Amino acid sequence: MRRLEGSMVAIVTPMKDGAVDLRALRDLTEWQLAEGTDGIVPCGTTGEGVTLTPAERADVIRTVIETVRGRALVIAGAGSNATHEAIESVKLAKTLGADAALVVTPYYNKPTQEGLFRHYQAIWEATRFPVVAYNVPSRTSVDLLPETVARLAKAGAIAGIKEATANMDRQVQLVEKVGKDAIAYLSGDDFTVLPYIACGGHGVISVIANVAPRAMKELVVAARSGDLAGALAKQAAMAELNRMMFVETNPGPVKAAVALLGRSGGELRLPLAPVSEASLAKVRDAMVRFGLKLA
């Protein structure tokens, strides 16, 4: 298995007239590779995976894999709050040729820690494919605790975790209980990439990399090489732009930002709605101040 590390993008899913725009997705993927991105993560939260049909998810993942052609990692979004559905999604990622699957903790039904353990264990037993557990309690209302991550790692059920709590004490606990390099530790929070890597993280699955991929790559490289002063300067420089990517619910602002770059339309699928004119102006201003060239 390839090492799951570096600067990865939670890539948006371009849409046009209500349908997935695969041509725009290919172009976005090629641009990400040209900018130095280490991994493409389709069909995650930012990629609106939960509102794609199964056929659309397959098309998106296949398009990314065929475009990448081994030049970067592909970690396919494959989560569900039904274990049997998650298993089928991970099997699809495996069949299509992804490097790993990103599997969010089950949402809405709020399983216990034992339920979470059995969920990921069942996926592993049914697929024998590398899984990155995705812990984002702010969206799912469940928290995959370090003790459970340690159980899963010991059982070989997960290859990594995308941790989106922005809690550095949590990351230290993970390293303590699981082991520094026992699994891949990937940040799911663009605001804390530097401290996360300093606490043993191996990289990031980033939202802002959709619009500033080279800047995120440079931040990750600086942090991983021990250039803390340089990394801090880069983290601080993108702080305002980071905030504006969440001025409304993700992925609304980032899709608007990608459209402002001229790289795809900003169309969203319901129940997500376009960002307001006021929010769009804030996004545009932050992009200009960061030095991005708008279309």
Swiss-Prot record:
Keyword Ion transport listed? The answer is no
One GO molecular function term of this record is: 4-hydroxy-tetrahydrodipicolinate synthase activity
Quote the Pfam families the UniProt record gives: DHDPS
Its biological purpose is as follows: Catalyzes the condensation of (S)-aspartate-beta-semialdehyde [(S)-ASA] and pyruvate to 4-hydroxy-tetrahydrodipicolinate (HTPA).
Tell me the active site.
134 (proton donor/acceptor), 162 (schiff-base intermediate with substrate)
Please report the name of this protein according to its UniProt entry. 4-hydroxy-tetrahydrodipicolinate synthase
Record the organism: Anaeromyxobacter dehalogenans (strain 2CP-1 / ATCC BAA-258)
Identify the enzyme class.
lyase
User: Which gene is annotated as encoding this protein in its UniProt record?
Assistant: dapA
